């Protein structure tokens, strides 16, 4: 939340690796584990909140689903934390939360997609097609959020590096 810079890196159409980093508020140490639990969300505390949500991912399903079929490394640091914290999740199995040196914000790395679900892996399209779909999604986010700087890297090659601007600029 409240990020001004977002970095997205993918390898092999996202099948080998996807890394997303931001300089936002970060995730509290105690919430780092919870972020990957099914139905975990910080966006709903009462029924009325359902009518006022204007963001993606409020149901708490995405991270838990992804963590069940790949290797996850997540690290985060809030402004109030002296050090950051990290966790590894392998196919839904959680490690302990550890301390890590990092700047404020969050990084989530997902690697080896469907390593433990080969039947699901067969439904992935060719890497170039998956890459194209991800690129199209990143472009939509860049256009929808000019106030955020985006870095987008595909297989080690920088594709986009935008500079944030206000709509009035």
Model-derived segments and spans:
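N-terminal phosphate-binding caps/lids of nucleotide- and nucleic-acid-binding domains
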Residues: 1-169
């Amino acid at each position: 939340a409240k990020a001004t810079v977002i970095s997205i890196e993918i390898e092999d159409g996202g099948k080998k690796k996807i890394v997303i980093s931001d300089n936002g508020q970060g995730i509290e140490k105690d919430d780092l584990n919870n972020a990957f639990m099914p139905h975990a969300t910080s966006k709903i505390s009462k029924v009325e909140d359902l009518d006022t949500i204007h963001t993606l991912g409020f149901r708490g399903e995405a991270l838990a689903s992804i963590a069940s079929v790949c290797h996850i490394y997540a690290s985060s640091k809030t402004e109030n934390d002296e050090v950051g914290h990290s966790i590894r999740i392998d196919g839904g199995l959680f490690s302990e939360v550890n301390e890590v040196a990092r700047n404020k914000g969050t990084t989530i790395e997902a690697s080896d997609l469907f390593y433990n679900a080969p039947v699901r892996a067969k439904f992935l399209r060719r890497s170039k097609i998956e890459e194209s779909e991800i690129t199209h999604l990143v472009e939509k986010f860049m256009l929808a959020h000019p106030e955020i700087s985006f870095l987008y890297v595909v297989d080690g090659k920088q594709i986009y590096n935008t500079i944030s601007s206000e709509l009035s600029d």
